[in-house]
């Protein structure tokens, strides 16, 4: 029966596509993790010093109004680095596409409330994606060495992006959330890793670049 043959053909096609997607996810994930394995730090005493820490943005609140632990833990990690003298300046890069949504300003406010002087904080309002944040750190803010501050899964991908864009980067891992709370984020991250390789293959550029800003001047 012709219709049955076509139906079976469609099933096989979907199965092959699914298998290829799974293989792609596994390969991309392993490659990113292996690349970052010697460049990630969780102990402040072992972390090398860099002039600038790149703090990757996120919202202070979840959609349900609860505190976003990813935000809180990244702030704590940044404070650890700053107070230990492991970074001199903090570049906060995040999303400010909407008038009432401003990741960099919220993070700046949280850091200043905990004692970081404003003169040591720089803001990048066009960090819409990790790619934008990393590339702009070099092209706009002139950084060729960075300590990237986020959770481990995010740092791994950011380090890979940084190296592909000529930046010598390490990552300082903020505390992660528990597996249940972070399940959706962790699943999304797997697909983000595949997309990162596609972006690199097509030489994807940030949404915006703009005038140069000198950190520490």
Q: Which positions does each model-derived feature cover?
A:
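A general structural signal for short secondary-structure boundary/capping elements
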Residues: 97-102, 170, 192-199, 215-217
